[in-house]
Amino acid sequence: MTSRLPTSALMPVLLATAIALPAAAHAQDSGQCRHSAPQTLALDIEGVRTARFDIGASKLRIDGAPSPDATLRGRACASSAGLLERLVLEQSKSGDTLTVRLRRDTSGSMGWFANNYAYLDLTGQVPANVLVQAIVGSGDAWVTGVAAASADVGSGDAELRRIAGRVTAKVGSGDITIDDAGELKVLSIGSGDVEARGIRGPVEIGSVGSGDFSLEGAAGDVRIGSLGSGDIDLRDVTGNVSVDSIGSGDLDVREVSGNLAVESKGSGDVSARDVRGTVTIPRKR
């Protein structure tokens, strides 16, 4: 089932993820809004267990609530009336998954140039017992107070706070902040940054390229796959820390109640302080 709001009624807005231009991001950050229109979308949340938001270059704030009003509200902004009318906000539902997309209507010949921009700034509530998935291009997302959450970020930013269960994250060149979550799984970090605090369970990191990962407080084991040329900073871990491989990057570990084990290491450095268990670090290759 698909619900699409006609542009003539609501003129909904957003660049598709692949068309998140720097000019649009600058306009969003500086609050430019030459042409605007109020936006409202009633979410079809009946029986929903997963709410997926594909926001591209826009801003979205989602809060979990026991009795949510389940309505997105905000405004659309664009550099021209024509661009405003070409942007679409739509939702579709498949089984227990609701997908909300904010995209540009690519029909016609209107192009995107250096001074063009279009973005949406929305706030809404969903049931507190759902999984919220945020797909972010160059925009910004805030998710608070839900059962579980995931963030797939390109060059934008995402903040996930007070998540009861697991947070899953993946970032290219952007930034992700996680504060107070049941457990954490980071699939990959490119050149961006992930900062985590107050994780009440285990932490798993797939790969870190040239970016950074920092963790303060984890009530479980921390497992790291590979570290390239970036940096990893770990503090206050109640459990063991294990790392499969380190290239030229640096690992800084403090206040670990269990063991620290690094399987292989290149030219990078490992600093370990206040580790109560055994410390196993190979010599540089």
Name every feature range the model reports, one short phrase each.
Residues 25-136, 142-153, 157-171, 175-188, ...:
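Acidic (Asp/Glu) and glycine-rich low-complexity loops/linkers
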Residues 233, 239-242, 252, 258-261, ...:
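Extracytoplasmic/luminal low-complexity segments enriched in Pro/Gly and acidic/polar residues
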Residues 1-7:
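N-terminal secretory signal peptides that target proteins for export/translocation
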Residues 9-21:
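Bacterial N-terminal signal peptides
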Residues 60, 193-194, 212-213, 231-232, ...:
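Short loop/beta submotifs within extracellular cysteine-rich repeat domains
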